[in-house]
Regions:
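Short, charged alpha-helical motifs in flexible N/C-terminal segments and linkers
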Residues: 1, 100-174
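Short, conserved micro-motifs composed of acidic
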Residues: 1-27
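Basic, alpha-helical interaction scaffolds
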Residues: 20-90
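Structural motif
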Residues: 23-26, 66-75, 131, 140-149, ...
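Extended, well-ordered alpha-helical segments in internal regulatory regions
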Residues: 79-94, 115-116, 148-165, 210-215
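Charged boundary/loop elements
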Residues: 85-99, 205-266
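Amphipathic alpha-helical
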Residues: 131, 167-207
Length: 266
């Protein structure tokens, strides 16, 4: 596999051989549970993940009505949520539309975690649409895939700020340790590097610092804690971020289309 973000003609003709045997070139390959592509768009991984979640949602529908709701939620956490959390700050930092397939599959599975009647499918005879899922997410304290990606990204950035992440990863970021809290401007906890490529803007190196600076400043302005958020230990920080994301997720009407997810406001 040759990584490139362009359809470069010389690269298409480039072959590698060992001992006279040409190595087969592939466009995508699974590595540590994540499907890598030669152009690093993550489309293959996202499509495969959406299919897997949709298939696992079928298991939830078969269990619905047979087991208590707490068991359904355990199954959801095992078969759905675990896949959404895994490396989501790697494959999920693209545009909102790029993960629509996954969000659709997640909403399908969420409709099955309550034993009450939730219309899960479109009725072609009556024209009835599937029920809205925003209240189901709220009742069960679940994060959408957009906010799961945001949470994982913020936690990763906080580990880097606390210098508890691996050194090689920490070296990729520029932590600002000289913060003037008396300034009228919002402090920047990470210095954001310049970028000429749109593809780079959709990586943790660029989007991570932007998201962290914005969210942490918003939380510090709420003054709900005597300790600034950026100075918290990891577990209190995770809890604070989860509450913030759930609160922002529950705001507004039931229409997800107009939902302003923090991940896409930076």
């Amino acid at each position: 596999m040759i990584f490139s973000n362009k359809n470069n003609e010389p690269l298409q003709c480039f072959n590698v051989s060992i001992g006279g045997v040409t190595i087969d070139r592939v466009e995508s390959e699974r590595f540590l549970g994540v499907i890598l592509e030669s152009n690093l768009t993550w489309k293959t991984h996202i499509s495969g993940l959406a299919t897997k979640i949709s298939r696992n949602a079928g298991i939830l529908f078969k269990l619905k009505g047979l087991v208590p709701e707490n068991v359904l939620k355990i199954v959801y956490n095992s078969l759905i949520q675990s896949h959404l959390y895994y490396c989501s700050n790697v494959w999920g930092l693209g545009s909102k539309s790029s993960i629509n397939k996954i969000f659709t599959a997640q909403k399908k599975s969420v409709r099955a975690i309550e034993n009450r009647f939730n219309n899960a499918f479109y009725n072609s005879e009556t024209g009835e649409l599937p029920c809205h899922t925003k209240e189901i997410f709220s009742r069960n304290s679940l994060l959408t895939v957009h906010n799961i990606i945001a949470k994982n990204s913020l936690v990763a950035m906080h580990k880097i700020r606390l210098n508890t992440a691996p050194m090689k990863i920490c070296s990729l970021f520029n932590v600002n340790n000289n913060i003037n809290y008396n300034s009228r401007r919002d402090p920047e906890f990470f210095n954001i590097p310049g970028s000429r490529l749109k593809a780079l803007d959709k990586t943790l190196c660029i989007k991570g610092p932007r998201l962290y600076n914005k969210v942490v400043n918003e939380l510090n302005k709420e003054h709900t804690s005597s300790l600034n958020v950026e100075r918290m230990f990891l577990n209190p920080f995770k809890n604070r971020i989860t509450c913030y994301l759930k609160s922002s997720q529950d705001d507004g009407n039931i229409d997800w289309a107009v939902q302003k997810f923090p991940l896409y406001t930076v």
